[in-house]
Swiss-Prot record:
GO cellular component: cytoplasm
EC number: 1.4.1.3
Keywords in alphabetical order: Cytoplasm, NAD, NADP, Oxidoreductase
Primary localization: cytoplasm
Name used for this protein in its record: Glutamate dehydrogenase
The species this protein was found in: Pyrococcus woesei
Catalytic activity of the protein: L-glutamate + NAD(+) + H2O = 2-oxoglutarate + NH4(+) + NADH + H(+); L-glutamate + NADP(+) + H2O = 2-oxoglutarate + NH4(+) + NADPH + H(+)
Length: 24
């Protein structure tokens, strides 16, 4: 199964956004 690099980046950005929300 080939993963779309953009999909990986989006998922990481979503994770980063959640982490920043928790940190605030």
């Amino acid at each position: 199964v080939e993963q779309d690099p953009y999909e990986i980046v989006i998922k990481q950005l979503e994770r980063a956004a959640q982490y920043m929300e928790i940190s605030e």
